[in-house]
Structure formats: structure tokens, C-alpha cells
Amino acid sequence: VWITGSYDHELGLSYWGTGNGGPWMGDTRPGDNLYATSVIALDVQTGELANHHQYHWNDSWDWDEVAAPLLIDYARNGQNIKGLIHAGRNGYLWFLERSEESIDFVDAKPYVYQDVFTNIDEETGRPEYDMSKKPGTGFEASFCPSLWGGKDWPPVAFDPTSRLLFIPANDNVCSTMVGEEVQYNPGQAFMGRGQSENGGFFI
């Protein structure tokens, strides 16, 4: 993590966004890579992990999700929800529900053009991928949004009066990237990213 988390004093939980794995190419680290590209909740009294939600699994796009979600309560289907809202680098706006026991998926909608996710599970929020859009070691792929994400580090803002969310978005920018083999050397970059380019285009 490298952006300060959010704090819910009623629940005694602090919410933090987490980065992507290294090297960048997911084929070098099989599995979901649990807790990467996620929001985690920490008990502020003990420092222990209380719960989590992973926005996307086995990242290969440098879509880290280090921005902490906003603690915004909202209504869905006539129900008031103690919410977490996150504008992801993966180009989706995530609506979650926070409680002492869990972080539950509610909804997710793209806020910029996104061509990697083919479906999001309605119960869990787990996305499915178009694997032709997922770069790997020696495998070039083009994808949207770019490696800069639908939103990079600048924070979002929320107006509680108008109920509007303001997102410093990177729209209409895509990337082409290929991974390369990399050896771990302490103190040096450990990305395994080969040639990449960004373009203001839709693939």
C-alpha cells in the first residue's frame, strides 16, 4: 500500500487498497494472488486482517488498487447500505457493503471504456476475462483502459449534497504490452514488463 486508508470509527475498522503483484505478468505467479488488487479491512485495536474484497484476480495490467474506498452510505433496491465505493484502476466503479463481519459485493459498473472483463459474478463480484486481452511472458496483448488505469493516483471526491462522485478519469486510452522473463535482484525493479505503448484509441 502507499495511499492512506479510510477509517470507520463505529466498526473500528480501517480500509486500505492494495497493489498488484510482481512481476507484472500473472503467468509468473499462478492463482488469484489473494489480497493483491483488493480492499482489506484491518482491526485498529489488534492490527489483524478482518475481511477483504478482491477487485480482480491475477493482475497482468498494472491495475493496482491502492486508493482507499470512500465510506459512503447509499440506497439499493429500497435498502440503506453502509457502503464502500471505489473507482478502480480496472475501469469499474465498485459498490460494496461494509460490516464488522465482511465486505460484500453489491454492484460494479464501468466508468471508462473497458474491454478486458467479459462478465462480473452477481453474487461475488469476481470478474471473468477475455484472455486475449491479458498480456503474459512473451505474449503481447492490447487492452483498455491502459496500464495507467481508468484512474491513477489522484483521489476521487464526493459531494454529499448533490450525491455526485467526481473521478479524475483517464478515458479513451489503451495499452499494448508484452511480458519478458525477469530475475529478482534486491533493490532493483521487479516488473518483467517488456515493450509497452499507450495510445488514445479503442481496440
Regions found by a protein language model. Name each.
Residues 16, 124, 148-149:
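Short glycine-rich loop/turn motifs that provide flexible caps or phosphate-binding loops at active sites
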Residues 25-65, 72-80, 92-143, 173-203:
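Extracytoplasmic/lumenal domain signature
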Residues 147-150, 196:
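A short catalytic or substrate-binding loop motif that flags glycine-/basic-rich loops and adjacent residues
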Residues 1-24, 28, 38, 63-88, ...:
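Repeat-blade elements of multi-bladed beta-propeller folds
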